[in-house]
């Protein structure tokens, strides 16, 4: 079905708005994936705070102009599914990576974060805010416990020398 000019402008504006508010973007080719599987992916995306859209490449090129995702233009070949992470930079990459494991025909073309093309593995393995805080707290706790142990050992050595 051919789109009229107003529809095309609305799509470009909608995708551009999503791109401006997104933390990262991932591009994929979903050719050969069943409708049921795509529906599951879309549902998972909504739950993860990811905005997904299938857009014509020419409209997508116009939509990402002036955004951090202009670097992805070379990946806009063939059927293009774009996903924007709104809550966590790795959400879309993690979602697509898991989906690609279960669906052979789903191909991830590229990802961008902070205006640069990034490896999908890098984005998918980024810790969430809660995970990062937990790691930091673990490191701080470990350092404090180590310092306490060294202090007690030094105190013990000093007392043994005095005796």
Swiss-Prot record:
Pfam families recorded: Ribosomal_L10
- PROSITE patterns per record: RIBOSOMAL_L10
GO (cellular component) term, any one: large ribosomal subunit
On whether rRNA-binding is a keyword of this UniProt record, the answer is yes
Endoplasmic reticulum found in the keyword field: no
The region annotated as signal peptide is none
Q: Which UniProt keyword terms apply here?
A: Ribonucleoprotein, Ribosomal protein, RNA-binding, rRNA-binding
GO terms of biological process kind: translation
Give a GO molecular function annotation for the protein.
large ribosomal subunit rRNA binding
Domain of life, per lineage:
Bacteria
Query: According to its UniProt record, which protein family does this protein belong to?
Result: Belongs to the universal ribosomal protein uL10 family.
Relate the assembly described in the record: Part of the ribosomal stalk of the 50S ribosomal subunit. The N-terminus interacts with L11 and the large rRNA to form the base of the stalk. The C-terminus forms an elongated spine to which L12 dimers bind in a sequential fashion forming a multimeric L10(L12)X complex.
Q: What does this protein do?
A: Forms part of the ribosomal stalk, playing a central role in the interaction of the ribosome with GTP-bound translation factors.
User: By what name is this protein known?
Assistant: Large ribosomal subunit protein uL10
């Amino acid at each position: 079905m051919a789109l009229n000019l107003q529809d095309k402008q609305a799509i470009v504006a909608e995708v551009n708005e999503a791109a401006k508010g997104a933390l990262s973007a991932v591009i994929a080719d979903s050719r050969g994936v069943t409708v049921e599987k795509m529906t599951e992916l879309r549902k998972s995306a909504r739950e993860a705070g990811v905005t997904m859209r299938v857009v014509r490449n020419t409209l997508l090129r116009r939509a990402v102009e002036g955004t951090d995702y202009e670097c992805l233009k070379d990946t806009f070949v063939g059927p293009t599914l774009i996903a924007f992470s709104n809550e966590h930079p790795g959400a879309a990459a993690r979602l697509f990576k898991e989906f690609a494991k279960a669906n052979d025909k789903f191909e991830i073309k590229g990802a961008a974060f902070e205006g640069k093309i990034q490896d999908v593995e890098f984005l998918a393995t980024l810790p969430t805010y809660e995970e990062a805080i937990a790691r930091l707290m673990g490191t701080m706790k470990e350092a404090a416990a180590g310092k306490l142990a060294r202090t007690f050992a030094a105190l013990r050595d000093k007392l043994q020398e005095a005796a």
